[in-house]
Structures are given as structure tokens and as C-alpha cells.
Amino acid sequence: MKIILWLCVFGLFLATLFPVSWQMPVESGLSSEDSASSESFASKIKRHSDGTFTSDLSKQMEEEAVRLFIEWLKNGGPSSGAPPPSG
């Protein structure tokens, strides 16, 4: 039983000597992939902010269309002869 314990301790010791980076060599400096991924990250942030703005604008336009439609209904709706608001 002591042999198994010592083998486990020795295995842990060896694991600390050979880290995971030993299996996959670390590239020195920035590669083109790194710079591309950083550009991609920046473009994703920009796209997200553009999408957020577009989403907010769409929501605001929908709310305005609903408000106009409700006003149209209050003012007589289809019986008034006026066409429904487009939007």
C-alpha cells in the first residue's frame, strides 16, 4: 500500500515538472491569428453596440406605431373613414 502512495506522490511531482504547456509549445510574440482575434473582438463589440442601438430604435418605433394605432381606434377607427396609420 505504501508503494502505491509513493507512486502517486512521485506522479504528482512529475506532473509539476512537466506542465501542460510542455505538450503544446507556446508561441512567442503575437501571431497573425492573435491580432485577427483581437480585431474580431473589437468588431464584435462594435456590432453589439450597433445591434443594441438598432434594437432600441426598433422598439421605440414599434411603441410609436402602437400609440398611433390606439389613437386611430379612439378617434373612430375603421368607421371614421381614415386609413389606419402605417408603420
Curated annotation (Swiss-Prot):
Keyword Transport applies: no
Residues modified to Serine amide: 86
SMART domains (UniProt xref): GLUCA
Domain of life where this protein originates: Eukaryota
Gene3D superfamilies: 6.10.250.590
Propeptide: 22-45
GO function terms (MF aspect): hormone activity; toxin activity
Biotechnological and industrial applications of this entry: [Lys(40)((68)Ga-DOTA)]exendin-3 is a promising tracer to visualize insulinomas (neuroendocrine tumors derived from pancreatic beta-cells in which GLP1R is expressed at >90%) with PET imaging.
Signal peptide: 1-21
Annotated Gene Ontology cellular component terms: extracellular region
Record's keyword annotation contains Thylakoid: no
Principal localisation: secreted
UniProt family annotation: Belongs to the glucagon family.
Purpose: Stimulates vasoactive intestinal peptide (VIP) receptors in high concentrations (>100 nM), resulting in both an increase in cAMP and amylase secretion from pancreatic acini, although at low concentrations (between 0.3 and 3 nM) it increases cAMP without stimulating amylase release. Stimulates the GLP-1 receptor (GLP1R). Induces hypotension that is mediated by relaxation of cardiac smooth muscle.
Designated name of the protein: Exendin-3
Organism: Heloderma horridum horridum (Mexican beaded lizard)
